[in-house]
Amino acid sequence: MNEAVTIRGKERYKSGVMEYKKMGYWEPDYEPKDTDVIALFRVTPQDGVDPIEAAAAVAGESSTATWTVVWTDRLTAAEKYRAKCYRVDPVPNSLGQYFAYIAYDLDLFEPGSISNLTASIIGNVFGFKPLKALRLEDMRLPIAYVKTFQGPATGIVVERERMDKFGRPLLGATVKPKLGLSGRNYGRVVYEALKGGLDFTKDDENINSQPFMHWRERFQYCMEAVNKAQAQTGEIKGTYLNVTAATMEDMYERAEYAKELGSIIVMIDLVIGYTAIQSMAKWARKNDMILHLHRAGHSTYTRQRNHGVSFRVIAKWMRLAGVDHIHAGTVVGKLEGDPATTKGYYDICREDFNPMTLENGLFFDQHWASLNKLMPVASGGIHAGQMHQLLHLLGEDVVLQFGGGTIGHPMGIAAGATANRVALEAMILARNEGRDYLHEGPEILAKAAQTCTPLKAALDTWKNVTFNYESTDTPDYAPTPSVSV
């Protein structure tokens, strides 16, 4: 039902239910402004639902609309504040799925707030009944919006200066087993790994303050290990002390204590939420600390191709939010990571400008307005025998974390660390000499292993270990005509 209200002979208002595409949320002739936030959604309408109407509904429900016309729209600049879907394309090789391009006026969002942005973009709209599924694939964040954020607290350049390590990836390891060790034994793992040649060790995502090891005990033993390893090797070392806790007050307390003990880096988990992440990033900037983010929980909404949020969007949000490290995939490891898609993630973290690169899943040009660069972290099922592949695929501005590949070494933790360091140094030398290190990699490693027993043992132990599974999230970039034409 749709009833018109007439005032002085002019139709001013219609009550009732209207199609979203007739309410101003579908504007195929709209030219996005430089200051617009643009979101690309993968829309899967219910059977029988017009894709244009479904896309317009996403625009409406993620901005100003509700299920019926409301007269209070007339009290606002409704034409300005309505999100505008201006393009709908069928997704290549995915029947019944459509890419919807939606522009949002910048004034819809609070400056410098990821929580406010996400409340609209991934809010109630994801539960909308006319849709079978909905996925946020990418976003174009205008410079005017990017400039309202702090960005990474430290950044790659300053982190390298602080560590005094240049021209190669940094090496790390996650302490294993992740749960159950006493504080003393935990600290011993940290010491052995750092002494053997790693730059960092790391708490895992779910080690906080449990009955078997209080957080304060862990921090003390870990920093004792860091200081001892630094004195022994003459190198700056670090360990990611996980300050994730139940409240912000607890997190600040733990972070302050880590600083008092001399730590250069603290860690948080993605599951603490966007407001907490930004709060810790501001603390890290103020206190000259590197902030590591473990992306715990992301696969619950990033892994499936038809519903959720792409990790490329999470990476963009986290660069804005201000973390210094983020796990971004390995390609060759045990966790999800298509090579082309993963390159897109790494480019988001490390480049000043991301051009539209459809083969890497980047649908828009993205300028980062001089925000610091974010160091990607590769971890999960990697070992020394893959060093040539890791260097080729991920470059040098990355932290390579060999957890099992260090602590599972048959000769012990220090030997595992040494194997990884020698493998990396051999590959960097080959690269600097101009050799084709990708194809000569096995030969380079075998030669280095002749004078490094730990590396030989690592190569023998894991030589046949691969994780060759088909990725569930790959780019869709075949050029197609728009259904809006």
UniProtKB/Swiss-Prot annotation:
It catalyses: 2 (2R)-3-phosphoglycerate + 2 H(+) = D-ribulose 1,5-bisphosphate + CO2 + H2O; D-ribulose 1,5-bisphosphate + O2 = 2-phosphoglycolate + (2R)-3-phosphoglycerate + 2 H(+). Its EC number is 4.1.1.39. One of its GO terms (biological process) is reductive pentose-phosphate cycle. GO terms for molecular function: magnesium ion binding; monooxygenase activity; ribulose-bisphosphate carboxylase activity. The keyword Magnesium applies. The lineage of its organism: Bacteria, Pseudomonadati, Pseudomonadota, Alphaproteobacteria, Hyphomicrobiales. Substrate binds at N124, T174, K178, R295, H327, S379. Keywords: Calvin cycle, Carbon dioxide fixation, Lyase, Magnesium, Metal-binding, Monooxygenase, Oxidoreductase, Photosynthesis. It holds the Pfam family RuBisCO_large. This is Ribulose bisphosphate carboxylase large chain. PROSITE patterns: RUBISCO_LARGE (PS00157). The keyword ATP-binding does not apply. Belongs to the RuBisCO large chain family. Type I subfamily. Heterohexadecamer of 8 large chains and 8 small chains.
